[in-house]
Swiss-Prot record:
F-type ATPases have 2 components, F(1) - the catalytic core - and F(0) - the membrane proton channel. F(1) has five subunits: alpha(3), beta(3), gamma(1), delta(1), epsilon(1). F(0) has three main subunits: a(1), b(2) and c(10-14). The alpha and beta chains form an alternating ring which encloses part of the gamma chain. F(1) is attached to F(0) by a central stalk formed by the gamma and epsilon chains, while a peripheral stalk is formed by the delta and b chains. GO terms for molecular function: proton-transporting ATP synthase activity, rotational mechanism. F(1)F(0) ATP synthase produces ATP from ADP in the presence of a proton or sodium gradient. F-type ATPases consist of two structural domains, F(1) containing the extramembraneous catalytic core and F(0) containing the membrane proton channel, linked together by a central stalk and a peripheral stalk. During catalysis, ATP synthesis in the catalytic domain of F(1) is coupled via a rotary mechanism of the central stalk subunits to proton translocation. This protein is part of the stalk that links CF(0) to CF(1). It either transmits conformational changes from CF(0) to CF(1) or is implicated in proton conduction. SUPFAM superfamilies: N-terminal domain of the delta subunit of the F1F0-ATP synthase. This is ATP synthase subunit delta. It comes from Neisseria gonorrhoeae (strain ATCC 700825 / FA 1090). The gene is atpH. NCBIfam families: ATP_synt_delta (TIGR01145), PRK05758.2-2 (NF004402).
Length: 177
């Protein structure tokens, strides 16, 4: 959701800045990942949305469920709960992860394929994409049968569409204009 992204951005940046100061970037990433996963579970999500449960109770429950030990991360959860923003934790995690990758000079890439790719194919694609985008890439692969064939690659806001669906869409657009 674009709205969540806008709301989460300053929280992610502030937390990342503090993590840099404390030299805790990677460990806090793990804590945020757990928080984001727990918040998306059905019972926890309904608890967060329940107005009769006060903010400190919600924060305490989340902290206990995840088993957070770090004082600053606990305080972060308490601040989010106090501002009724616990539901943005998955987006905060996603943006914090992007900041971490950027800090380490790594970009995130998603390869969409109509069919499962072998490890060898993913490796070859990774080499080609690393050269093309002149950066080290953290690659994930997702299967999308509607592509019909070929692949589509997303790196940040750049899209490389080499799928049959993309070619057919381009052909249709050309023929109808």
């Amino acid at each position: 959701m674009a709205e969540f992204a806008t709301i989460a951005r300053p929280y992610a940046k502030a937390l990342f800045g503090l993590a840099q100061e404390k030299n805790q970037i990677e460990s806090w990433l793990g804590g945020l990942e757990k928080l984001a996963a727990v918040v998306q579970e059905g019972k926890v999500a309904s608890l967060i949305d329940r107005p009769e449960t006060n903010a400190s109770e919600k924060a305490d429950i989340l902290i206990d469920l995840v088993g957070l030990k770090d004082k600053e991360l606990k305080n972060f959860v308490i601040v989010l709960a106090g501002q009724k923003r616990l539901s943005i934790l998955p987006e905060v995690y996603a943006q914090y992860q992007d900041l971490t990758l950027s800090f380490n000079h790594i970009k995130s890439a998603v390869i969409y394929s109509a069919y499962p790719l072998t490890d060898k194919q993913v490796g070859e694609l990774a080499q080609m994409l690393n050269k093309r985008f002149d950066s080290e890439l953290k690659i994930s692969v997702e299967i999308e049968p509607e592509l019909i064939g070929g692949i589509k690659v997303e790196v940040g806001d750049q899209v490389l569409d080499l799928s049959v669906q993309g070619k057919l869409s381009a052909l249709y657009t050309t023929m109808t204009n």
